[in-house]
Amino acid sequence: MTPESQSLQVLSRSRSPFNDIYVIQRQNLREMWFQGTGELYLQSRIDLSRPGELALVYCRLFLAPLLWNPDPARVLVIGLGGGALPRFLHEVYPELFNEVVEVDRQVTELARRHFFFRESSRLRVFEEDGRSFVQRRQREYDIVFLDAFKGGSVPYHLKTVEFYREIERSLKPGGLLATNLYGQSNRLKPRDRATLESVFPQVTCFEDPDRVATVCVASAQNAGVPEEMFRSGLGCLPESVLRHLSWMENVDMIKKGGILEPGNSIFEDDFEAGEFFRAVRRNNRRDPSPSPPYPIRHSS
């Protein structure tokens, strides 16, 4: 698939120090794509006939932490894309403090211009690397949503056990990390789960039947939550949230075993402490190599 296809209208094509970015439209669907390693990767989608709804299955799965905490007070979103998730949370939780970190100014500008993203006193965007922000901010969150991505890969310093420890320290007691592990094209998910479980005692993964999207929710709490409690506790979610989604569908997507069995190794920082900022700059720039440390490949 290419944005130049006759069935698509290219609304914007731009290049930043971090990404090659397309905004395209076909009928009612408007999408943001990143290009990397010669391929295109979908980042965000809105249905213009229903712009307040979450059009991508991974965004709907990303709301799974609300099954544990139906009334968060402060959340952090690392990676903006088109802004669908923070915009949705801002709408259904008007009192929520929602901080978003996006390293690429061009992505933020395109989200404002084409995807109806607007900031407010309770929805703020910080132009910064996600890990640098977590280290600097020193704030406690109910939920951290980790969704950083660039064309063809994930910045490696945002996938390691050291970063997960930093996130764990930024969570309130009982706080949750939700991380996007992508779909079947990601062959590194077993190592992802092993890395998460080396920091968080409880990790629950969700995956849709077509394996388009995988989201893991990690908690520092030792006790797991039985599915029966999820099912019986759905009524605790605000009506503003319940009317947008089939929450029973989310519960049914809890993944047991299979590809998400923990791997035998974990992701660790590949730099010394004094090299942190150099590693961040290297990992965030557009991929100069066809073999980045954490690649995402399209499935054949």
Regions found by a protein language model. Name each.
Residues 182-197:
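Conserved class I S-adenosyl-L-methionine
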Residues 8, 14, 25, 50-173, ...:
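The AdoMet/dcAdoMet-binding core of the Class I SAM-like
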Residues 37, 41-50:
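Acidic/histidine-rich helix-loop elements
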Residues 2-31, 35-37, 202-300:
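Soluble small-group transferase modules, centered on the S-adenosyl donor enzyme superfamily
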Residues 149, 182-184, 208, 221:
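Histidine- and/or cysteine-centered catalytic micro-motif in compact active-site loops
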Residues 38-40, 149-152, 177:
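A short, flexible beta-alpha/helix-coil linker loop
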Residues 174-181:
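Conserved beta-strand signature within the Rossmann-like core of class I S-adenosyl-L-methionine
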